[in-house]
């Protein structure tokens, strides 16, 4: 479906022809995205998309340009030029709710060792910050404290007026790769294979200065941490290059769960073929997470895994969801999931329940959950019985969007305006719900006829 609009599909890569890649026919009855708009403005890889409001988004990438788009029409609204090298991070800094002047700031970091703060409604540069000793790889906003943080070889804290409030000493030549806020005025930073917990100390009557203190280092990962997100207010999750998934307590920073076993010799492949597919560490690298109140969705190598927070186990997986590594995953309404890959495809999945047969226990080799140390065999018996009798799920392919000719880096979902994807082919594609768009066109036509008086004349 949609292959003819662009001119051909993707070529299988690597071991794709040997892998059990799920396919779908041309008649994708459950796929609403039957129309597309191709947006051209960039001259290099487009790596980032960020939503500005209900109808606007910004794109950025290796050409150093930021472009603001209308998600409904695909119209190019603004082009922000200022960086001389590729953009490495982009975030928005919304106005405070108490502030009367509602201007949204866009912050961009670049390999040119600068951060530029932009007015989100104009092309105006509010300020350029060029005091960094290394490339800033991540940015995050602490809305409650009305500050933002930049992470490179050190960690800096800034206010809305762009004053440097405090900073850490040099942390690592590797630099901070990811950064999230956790409770108690703390943030957790991924630095190589380490997690570092920092606490922000705001000014008080006794001290007028801000400070940032290192309070703990978590050394449980065996390889570089590639992904880090909050699960909820009480926990966060990390994933590494060699397929380690760890769930952490966000309050006391202890390990709640650890797993690095992402294959078993079960139905999809025979043992030798499965082992062959998993020989390269890249096949089990955890590239991205997303979550909701019930599940964590993990992009692991070429596969997708759904881990139930309540049942403490994987409830569904597609070990070969794409021909190449899955780079981004997000949850949609109606138990749907979207993934994109280095193979140039975007795929839509539906999480469906299926009752396990009594003789077919739910696999427990994925994400086995334990607290502090191993549980005893006796203590694990009730858990095992519960898993064997529990309802498991499957990920069923319901849509395959073929439009990009190279790696799809990430995407955004707009409830009213469709799906936006960006790619190494320099393009952005706006995927539209065909039925909805047809209805809107008909409505606009009737409104125009009514305004001109032609509707009554025709009747």
Curated annotation (Swiss-Prot):
It is found in: Cytoplasm. It comes from Homo sapiens (Human). This is WD repeat-containing protein 41. Changing residue 445 to R: Reduces interaction with the C9ORF72-SMCR8 complex. No effect on interaction with SMCR8. Keywords: Autophagy, Cytoplasm, Repeat, WD repeat. Non-catalytic component of the C9orf72-SMCR8 complex, a complex that has guanine nucleotide exchange factor (GEF) activity and regulates autophagy. The C9orf72-SMCR8 complex promotes the exchange of GDP to GTP, converting inactive GDP-bound RAB8A and RAB39B into their active GTP-bound form, thereby promoting autophagosome maturation. As part of the C9orf72-SMCR8 complex, stimulates RAB8A and RAB11A GTPase activity in vitro, however WDR42 is shown not be an essential complex component for this function. GO terms for molecular function: GTPase activator activity. One of its GO terms (biological process) is negative regulation of exocytosis. Its main location: cytoplasm. GO terms for cellular component: cytoplasm; guanyl-nucleotide exchange factor complex; lysosomal membrane. Component of the C9orf72-SMCR8 complex, at least composed of C9orf72, SMCR8 and WDR41. The complex is formed of two protomers, each individually consisting of one molecule each of C9orf72, SMCR8 and WDR41. The protomers homodimerize via an interaction between C9orf72 (via C-terminus) and SMCR8 (via N-terminus). Within each protomer SMCR8 (via DENN domain) acts as a bridging protein between WDR41 (via C-terminus and N-terminus) and C9orf72 (via C-terminus). The C9orf72-SMCR8 complex associates with the ULK1/ATG1 kinase complex. Signal peptide: none annotated.
